[in-house]
Amino acid sequence: GLGDVYKRQPKEWLDALTPLGTDENKKFIENAPYLIAIFEKKFSVSKNKKIKNYYVKESVGIATGILITCLHFSGLAMLTHTPSPMTFLNKILKRPSNEKPFVLLIVGRPDKDVKVPKFAKQKKKFEEITSIF
């Protein structure tokens, strides 16, 4: 279970999560009306021949960003979840081995009692994340 995942993680990683108030309890997954599993497809198979797909991470990342934007503009809330390891998704969703889980999106409307941690709302200034040449 997820508790086992947390037991295997380095203390530094667990300490980094502390301000977010996150732990092995993921009730939001059970309560969300939609779970969207996004996979990257490393290669395709055609006539028993393996065909490499290029720029997979870039393409899947861009497509995921567009989907997240659409979800937000549709009035839905979402968060990303990347349990480690994610290969269990291949098994439960019956996906082939040439597909690798990329991210799990938990989608729905926020619980009426939801509290977003103050730490999660702290954003860097534009100047801190941008270099203009």
Task: Please name every model-derived segment.
Residues 89-104:
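Short, electropositive alpha-helical surface patch
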Residues 32-35, 101-102:
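Short, surface-exposed beta-edge/turn micro-motifs
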Residues 37-39, 106:
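Short beta-strand segments
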Residues 2-6:
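Short, small-residue-biased leader/transition segments that mark boundaries at the very start
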Residues 36, 44-45, 49-92:
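Small-aliphatic-rich amphipathic alpha-helix that forms the alpha element of a beta-alpha
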Residues 11-23, 49:
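Short acidic (Asp/Glu) patches
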Residues 103-133:
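C-terminal helix-cap and adjacent tail motif
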Residues 27-31:
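Extracellular/periplasmic catalytic domains that process cell-envelope and extracellular macromolecules
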